[in-house]
């Protein structure tokens, strides 16, 4: 029983770390953005979304970045995914202008992803909810972050 509980805890901590890294990536993109769309579903997308729902649209000097939520692009991913389409990051973490626009899975196994723009409070509330089986039980993890919108133009 202890071994199973330890395995569940390790899995929970690993999935939580994946969520926090995903939120860090969005925060990094937001810090490099010049504008944010109030209606990402109406904005011109950085690439094909293949039926996924746009949840966040940023404008940067290197080009637009679209985050979308929905069906995974291939069977290797678990459940629904959060994808990022936009300029790639260089080794220094800065966005590279002029290159290809990769469309990559940020995190999989999602039940829900919410990006709520709260201009009156000057923040973006981003939430990721995952559900997965571990030790024969369903576990759910929810991570949320408030991201500062200071200096961003509302598009």
Task: Identify the meaning behind each predicted range.
Residues 42-121:
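Type IV pilin-like appendage domain
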Residues 21-23, 38-45:
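Transition segment at domain starts
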Residues 1-31:
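Aliphatic-rich helix starts adjacent to a transmembrane/signal segment
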Residues 28, 95-100, 139-141:
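Surface-exposed beta-strand edges and their flanking turn/coil or helix-capping segments
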Residues 102-155:
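Short linear sequence signals and composition-biased patches located at protein termini or domain-edge surfaces
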